[in-house]
UniProtKB/Swiss-Prot annotation:
It comes from the Eukaryota. InterPro entries: PAP (IPR039633), PAP/fibrillin_dom (IPR006843). Pfam families: PAP_fibrillin (PF04755). It comes from Oncidium hybrid cultivar. This is Chromoplast-specific carotenoid-associated protein C1, chromoplastic.
């Protein structure tokens, strides 16, 4: 908008009355200096004052409106992304809960019916499609730690889990896998418990990262843990046997001696070192594909397509 000149206050003297009655005759303009009597006053003009530019303000307001719209768009996009993330988390959490519910009572898959296996496989497939870490070997810190086997379709474990002759003496209490991402080691362990003892069989292996999802495992040695015998055997003073009351109080001294002997033997055996043996046959290598991984659940597939569902030690999913 063009600036408007503001004229400062100035004085104009009126002509005398006689002059107004008889104005002087007009004469042609001639070059040269004007006479002092007719020389016009030079009007003093102050510096022009620029009025506010409404156009600039309007443009600024338009830009601010555009910025506000852009900010609203960003906020809306963030809110939408947060809603989508929250929704995805809820879906994954619901799928994990359903999976754990399906695994209940299956004895790590040994007692699962064909219908249950189908439902478990469907839930596993859905979780794999929503894997929050599609490149698990690039998130080795999540792989770190001790993982408890909750389910497997690996038929090679079923004879171990279901052998009736073995269950009369020992029962498989826990199968676990411990991963050390800094040392690139894997330790697989099976713990057995019996009436008066417990023991474990462990394999130690090294692993190499072969792809974002796959690791190659090479087993190096096996370890048979020394049986941990119960160091105290409690024999009651009285008990009922086929309807007849048996009183052992007269033999209390003998029983105490037996308990002390059992405790001594248990401590002696338990203090012995474990038995180690090398693993060097052609079956000492395998690969493992991690298809789902978060901070409490891992799903892996091995040679032949066998699936393993493992839960991180300390996770609420174990309770």
């Amino acid at each position: 908008m063009t600036s408007i000149a503001f004229w400062n206050a100035f004085t104009v003297n009126p002509f005398p009355a006689a002059a107004r009655r008889s104005p002087p005759p007009l004469t042609p303009f001639t070059s040269g200096a004007l006479s002092p009597a007719r020389k016009p006053r030079i009007l003093e003009i102050s510096h022009p004052r620029t009025l506010p530019s409404f156009r600039v303000q309007a443009i600024a307001e338009d830009e601010w409106e555009s910025e506000k719209k852009a900010l609203k768009g960003v906020v809306g996009s963030v809110a939408l992304a947060e809603d989508e993330t929250t929704g995805a988390d809820l879906v994954v959490s619901d799928l994990k809960k359903k999976l754990i519910d399906q695994l209940f009572g299956t004895d790590r898959g040994l007692k699962a019916t064909s219908e249950t296996r189908a439902e478990v496989n469907e839930l596993i497939t859905q979780l794999e499609a929503k894997n929050p870490n599609p490149a698990p070997t690039e998130a080795l810190s999540l792989l770190n730690g001790r993982w408890i086997l909750a389910y497997t379709s690996f038929a090679g474990l079923f004879p171990l889990l279901g052998a009736e002759s073995l269950q009369q003496l020992l029962k498989v209490d826990e199968i676990s896998q411990t991963i050390d991402s800094e040392g690139f080691t894997v330790q697989n362990s099976v713990r057995f418990v019996g009436p008066f003892s417990s023991t474990s069989v462990t394999t130690n292996a090294k692993f190499e990262v072969r792809s974002p999802k796959r690791v190659q495992i090479k087993f190096e040695e096996g370890i048979i843990g020394t049986p941990q015998l119960t160091d105290s055997i409690v024999i009651p003073d009285k008990f009922e046997f086929f309807g007849q009351n048996i009183d052992l109080s007269p033999f209390k001294g003998v029983i105490s001696s037996l308990q002390d002997t059992a405790s001594s033997v248990a401590k002696t055996i338990s203090s012995q070192p474990p038995i180690k043996f090398p693993i060097s046959n052609s079956n000492a290598q395998s690969w493992l594909l991690t298809t789902y991984l978060d901070d409490e659940l891992r799903i892996s597939r091995a040679d032949g397509g066998s699936v393993f569902v493992l839960i991180k030690e300390g996770s609420p999913l174990l309770t």
